[in-house]
């Protein structure tokens, strides 16, 4: 089954209910939300989610486990100086997700800053191990997102993501493949068979449980991270459609994070375009 949706807003007054209502209107069967603004860690009480109303009206169309949660961008679990805050916040975020039976938490791996890459990857692994200890009774899984290599980002290669997965050794840790990010990091999606073979050869394919499907405004290997609308960037519609329809990605939530136009988001048009055979 193809699972295709988008990032949708999560805001007052109806929070989750309106998020999923919008997703269904767009023709989606999965969705991604932030449980607050992407740039901060403020959170509302679970009672405001309108969760029971969502279950009653929409859970037959988009199940709780097909609602992906994205962690705030400002969290840096790879930082030797800021890891304690990341551990505390992400542990609390997982407990919030447990209440709603959400399954996947997408996490940017973080930045190495003034430290070196290996020390930061080791810190990231320690942070995740600690989070899993604190939330040992949880079913929530953390998905480390593949990054573009902008600035001092860690997670810019499959090997860096796999290094952390291998150190943590938990079935609760996997990967989120972002097409714009891997393109900007130097993985050529336009040579689709080579791209796919590398996913298999490196061993990361079996860990991918969420996909962010975005076109890119920049050249291959640019390390920029600038998303483009579907078929408006340098990856192009053909190869993004190949990902959507490839059986190896069956039943994986595929989430659009493409830019808004002057008239607002066009996720409905992009979803329809991608589902067309």
Swiss-Prot record:
SMART domains: AP2Ec
Annotated residues for binding of Zn(2+) 1: 70, 108, 145
Gene3D superfamilies: Divalent-metal-dependent TIM barrel enzymes
Signal peptide (residue range): none
Enzyme Commission number(s) from the entry: 3.1.21.2
Sites where the protein binds Zn(2+) 2: 145, 178, 212, 257
Catalysed reaction equations from the record: Endonucleolytic cleavage to 5'-phosphooligonucleotide end-products
Free-text cofactor note: Binds 3 Zn(2+) ions.
GO molecular function: deoxyribonuclease IV (phage-T4-induced) activity; DNA binding; DNA-(apurinic or apyrimidinic site) endonuclease activity; phosphoric diester hydrolase activity; zinc ion binding
GO terms classed as biological process: base-excision repair
Superkingdom to which the source organism belongs: Bacteria
Keyword DNA repair listed: yes
Cofactor(s) recorded in Swiss-Prot or TrEMBL: Zn(2+)
Keywords: DNA damage, DNA repair, Endonuclease, Hydrolase, Metal-binding, Nuclease, Zinc
Cited Pfam families: AP_endonuc_2
InterPro entries in UniProt: AP_endonuc_2, AP_endonuc_F2_Zn_BS, Xyl_isomerase-like_sf, Xyl_isomerase-like_TIM-brl
Entry's transmembrane regions: none
UniProt: Zn(2+) 3 binding residues: 181, 225, 227
Family assignment from sequence similarity: Belongs to the AP endonuclease 2 family.
Described function: Endonuclease IV plays a role in DNA repair. It cleaves phosphodiester bonds at apurinic or apyrimidinic (AP) sites, generating a 3'-hydroxyl group and a 5'-terminal sugar phosphate.
Protein name (database record): Probable endonuclease 4
Organism of provenance: Mycoplasmopsis pulmonis (strain UAB CTIP)
Native organism taxonomy: Bacteria, Bacillati, Mycoplasmatota, Mycoplasmoidales, Metamycoplasmataceae
Gene giving rise to this polypeptide: nfo
């Amino acid at each position: 089954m193809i699972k295709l949706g988008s990032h949708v807003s999560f805001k007052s007054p109806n929070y989750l209910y309106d998020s999923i209502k919008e997703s269904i209107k767009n023709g989606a069967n999965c969705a991604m939300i932030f449980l607050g603004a992407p740039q901060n860690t403020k959170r509302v009480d679970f009672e405001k989610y309108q969760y029971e109303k969502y279950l009653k009206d929409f859970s037959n169309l988009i199940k709780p486990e097909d609602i992906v949660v994205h962690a705030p961008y400002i969290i840096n679990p790879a930082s030797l100086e800021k890891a304690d805050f990341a551990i505390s916040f992400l542990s609390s975020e997982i407990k919030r997700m447990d209440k709603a039976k959400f399954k996947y938490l997408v996490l940017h791996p973080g930045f190495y800053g003034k430290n070196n890459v290996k020390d930061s990857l080791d810190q990231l692994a320690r942070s995740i191990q600690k989070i899993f200890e604190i939330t040992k009774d949880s079913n929530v899984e953390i998905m480390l997102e593949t990054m573009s290599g902008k600035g001092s980002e860690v997670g810019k290669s499959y090997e860096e993501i796999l290094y952390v997965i291998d150190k943590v050794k938990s079935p609760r840790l996997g990967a989120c493949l972002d097409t714009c990010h891997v393109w900007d990091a130097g993985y050529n999606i336009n040579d689709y068979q080579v791209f796919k073979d590398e996913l298999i050869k490196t061993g990361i394919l079996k860990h991918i449980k969420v996909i962010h499907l975005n076109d890119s405004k920049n050249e291959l290997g640019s390390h920029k991270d600038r998303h483009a609308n579907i078929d408006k960037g340098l990856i192009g519609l053909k190869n993004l459609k190949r990902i959507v329809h490839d059986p190896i990605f069956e039943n994986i939530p595929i989430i659009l994070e493409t830019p808004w136009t002057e008239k607002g988001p066009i996720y409905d048009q992009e979803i329809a375009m991608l589902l067309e055979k």
